[in-house]
């Protein structure tokens, strides 16, 4: 009978602890090292684009099941393969400059969310340079010891707003 009582107390204590953990809000951890790694991944993708490297190289950090929302398509784009094939179509413009403003990384274990304002310059087919501005979010997950981009949302912002 004593073992049953001890077990019951342990089970009750464990249940209470579990309920307290479930009710506790999750807060992002401050991790400057992970924040630097995540921001560097976005910047390296931009550098690869500006250098004109192949799309496979530009998309090397995308997960196979990558998804994206952007201002060019009204639907969810699904898959690294789709993203790479769409990027291989010769664009009418070229990235000349890309920068991250107000970057913030929230870390939740093996998940990191990068939120920032994108400020870039693109040269159009007519040779004119125009700003490229967006409110952006990227979600990275650590897979096999490497950070992989699993989702992105790029919301264009009109110049001057």
What are these regions (language model features)?
Residues 2-15:
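Bacterial N-terminal signal peptides that target proteins for export
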Residues 18-27:
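C-terminal segment of classical bacterial N-terminal signal peptides
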Residues 29, 125-131, 159-160:
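A short acidic/glycine-rich loop-to-helix N-cap element
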Residues 32-39, 53-108, 117, 130-132:
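A solvent-exposed, acidic/Ser-Thr-rich amphipathic alpha-helical stretch
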Residues 49-50:
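Hydrophobic/aromatic side-chain positions at a characteristic register within alpha-helices
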Residues 113, 133-158:
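Short beta-strand edge/turn micro-motifs at domain boundaries
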Residues 120-124, 140:
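Beta-strand elements of well-folded, non-transmembrane domains
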């Amino acid at each position: 009978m004593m073992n049953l009582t001890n077990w019951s107390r342990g089970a009750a204590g464990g249940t209470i602890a579990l309920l307290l953990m479930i009710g506790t809000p999750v807060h992002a951890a401050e991790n400057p090292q992970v924040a630097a790694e995540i921001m560097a991944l976005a910047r390296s993708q931009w550098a690869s684009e500006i250098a004109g490297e192949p799309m496979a190289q530009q998309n090397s950090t995308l997960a196979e099941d990558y998804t994206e929302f952007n201002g060019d398509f009204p639907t969810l784009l699904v898959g690294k393969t789709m993203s790479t094939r769409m990027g291989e179509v010769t664009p009418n413009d070229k990235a000349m400059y890309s920068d991250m403003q107000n970057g913030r990384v929230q870390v939740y274990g093996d998940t990191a969310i990068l939120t920032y304002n994108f400020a870039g310059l693109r040269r159009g087919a007519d040779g004119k340079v125009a700003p490229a501005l967006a409110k952006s979010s990227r979600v990275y997950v650590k897979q096999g010891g490497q950070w992989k981009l699993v989702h992105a949302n790029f919301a264009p912002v009109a110049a001057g707003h």
